[in-house]
Amino acid sequence: YYDEKNLPKTAAVNVAEYIDHFEPWVRAGYEVIHINLGSSLSSAYQNCCIAAEELGQVHVIDSCSLSSGTGLLVRDAGEMIRQGMSADAIADVLRQRTEKCHASFILDTLTFLHAGGRCSSVAALGANVLKLKPCIEVNNADGSMKVGKKYRGSLDKVLVKYVKDQLAAHPDIDPSFIFITHSGIAAEYIHLVKEALKAEKDFAEIHVTTACCTISSHCGPNTLGILFETK
């Protein structure tokens, strides 16, 4: 992008691709639980539902989230599978649990959102000139995204303040697990966020993941978020 000003292109998985992916499992006698990118963010969910209706035995979950926000539900599903629950029962629980999953992230720059057509040039220029780093929050009721608090300052100070704000806003957070997810960021920032989390709450597990190429291409480097469940 820096050399040619071109971003990778992203596209939703189509119905035929979903059928090709699920059909071998269904034919083998399995029931499939598929946790999809939020329906407000992509047409992939609708395409998956069409494929599932044609195949049968595929339970499609609208995560109302993205990235490791869906990962939270995957962890929950895995635990319920280990407990021996049926696919129908697991799907029902997951659909009820989406509103307990919280996803947000800090953008270091709006340059990449602008390049992908997701914000105006005026907004991008203003944010970059003022050194604003917006917090993007995912609405866990429908998967839509909104701009939350706009932070100003160096990335290290912004990340610490962001962590404190997110945890303060969710006093009923589940302390057993939390994701730190980033699009490619220096290890020192990951360590900083880990220490900020530990200073605020005694998490049993802090798991660091890298965002997928789709998310990263829209957000750009140095994007970082924390993703967790509430009780």
Predicted regions and their residues:
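N-terminal glycine-rich anion-binding loop in soluble enzyme alpha/beta folds
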Residues: Y1-E17
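Mixed-charge interfacial surface used for oligomerization/domain docking
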Residues: E4, Y30, S40-H59, S65-K231
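Short, contiguous strand/loop micro-motifs
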Residues: P8-K9, I35, I180-T181
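N-terminal glycine-rich phosphate/adenylate-binding segment common to multiple enzyme folds
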Residues: V15-Y45
